[in-house]
Amino acid sequence: MELNYGKSYLSESEQVRVNRKFCTGIHKNCILYLTDGILQNPVIKNNQYRFSQLQFEKNKAYYGNNHWIIKRNISVLAESLKRALIIRKDDFVSRSDAGQLVPERLWKIGRTDDDKLFNRKKRSEDSEFVIDVLIDSSGSQAGRQAQVAAQGYIISEALSQAGIPHRVTGYCAFWGYTVLQRFRDYEDPRETNERIFQFRAYANNR
């Protein structure tokens, strides 16, 4: 696995603990392999490393050729996310059977079954949250690797601009393993988004 996907960022004991926790039931024959990728942590610079480096260069070239379109998409998505966050924090008013009486509805008493004569102010959800972005890294994406990398980058950049903590992970199946390649983690700085261009699609989709 290390020769194909680089070293795991977990120690051997941590890998055992993670697999014992999550690989149960119908997944008991599955083995999780968590890595930052062969370009980030290679054992040796073998053919798999060179293939991954070549795809990274293709992904970056695609970004360079479509830079303005990608930047525009990032901006549009980021603004949508920011607006959604503002709305999410706003209070809203709903009809209710208790709260502040609305005189204009008093005529309904005895005439209709509608007993919602009041308005009640409710606080919107203000809890914090994080987002996980999963990217299909299986061979089914082999014909559009640069596009997938760009799409992942657009989403990650927009989330970063909106100030939303997020993690981006690629997944595929290889030799009985489910490989989870971490491109960025929740608290990583924005420049870490560039690692999404290390995306390479091969192996299977579990």
List each model region and its residues:
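Residue-level preference for alpha-helix termini and adjacent loops
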Residues: 32, 108, 117, 140, ...
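Generic detector of short, locally flexible boundary/turn motifs and exposed helical patches
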Residues: 94-101, 131-136, 196-199
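Solvent-exposed, non-transmembrane amphipathic alpha-helical segments
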Residues: 79, 83, 87-90, 94-97, ...
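Von Willebrand factor
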Residues: 107-108, 123-206
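Acidic/polar low-complexity segments with low predicted structural confidence
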Residues: 1-128
